[in-house]
């Protein structure tokens, strides 16, 4: 019975059927299936399939984002019933740097991290440097993930790193950077710890730090 | 030694005739910020006042030496004319604040039917642009003016609440209202383009900024991008005006669709494209421009010295200039991270290395 539901919710996420994903999540709860088990056996494998399809260019951003919406429709229903776990496998502060409003890449990283048990504090987009610094001091994340799509705002990324040093926070958090114009060279130049080209790279990196489950 | 006016030079290169030298055609956008600051204006002032905008745009040719004028210098004109609201809050260095959409005209599919194609002589900042084009044409009749229209999908992202993410999701859902909205944005760009041509623009330039190779498939590009740009191209082509097309990021997977489907007069290439490949494959069929790096983390126009810019420009010129059909250009817009001396270095490189014998 449960296996059938896992398969159905998996299919709903892969094809991006938002209503069906939500309905199945509610049905799973009504059938007294553990929400964590539904997440682990239904939702997480679904996003792995979606990610694979994206890599193979069977899916592009429109299909991937639609699947993400279906994932969140179900995940948010299940999350409300999950035993509260404040840090998960690790706490990630994530956002788009000041001056940039492009947040699709950041959102894709967030969904993959959340789907794999990391707790993400989403700062949103065009986030002032000071807000990052305050939040790092306040919530003590394990990771700070910064994104920008635009070249001119790479400077904001550099300044955020400088701010962390100035405030004595730099050694308290691992910093990953990504986005269209970013490269390993730039990452090293500004003193970040990691550069990733995509959400899978980001997941591999945080898992390599916290250790796999 | 210049023997042609910028207009003659630009047209000669575009039509595969021999110009005196390679023209330097630039997409000035936030790169004008250096001058906005020197003139002690804010972005809001300069984008909303014809006299102030004229002062800034004029410098593209008189100060930097580009062979063209390019305006609007921001991307939000169509979105604003269609009813979205801007706030000047996006920091872009030096304490300056650019406009970003803060309230979208379309929140639900039914909103699309409530919006009419704006009248360019009245809507939003369009009259400001038209006024500046008229003044430029009068004062500089020998310098071509490129009037800029947003790609229809980019305008959709400026009028649809949820921006590109919502557009992508609605595309995947195959929501029919997205095509209605693309059509509305296309007709808006056509109306704006025609008005700019009437005011004195000699070319219409466009950018496809969100529908890039890592985001959409060639099939999606064929459905959501090509037919709409083609309509703009046909509408201005009927007036004898060329359509100049820039695809952000790597245009390679879409090039056949662009060249055969949209049929612009020229494609301006992004940093990501191998200019040699583009010249060899398409350079006889269509004019090309490009592509001194401006938008990657190693972008020479942003981080290099003027000497390094000249060396990079020389490489582009050597590829592009044989057989004509080539404009020297940056790999994307001239943005506020590009130092003024590096813009001038492009022009110097064309004069030094781009002279036709």
Stretches found by the model and what they are:
Chain B
Residues 44-55, 62-64:
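Short, structured active-site "lid" loops
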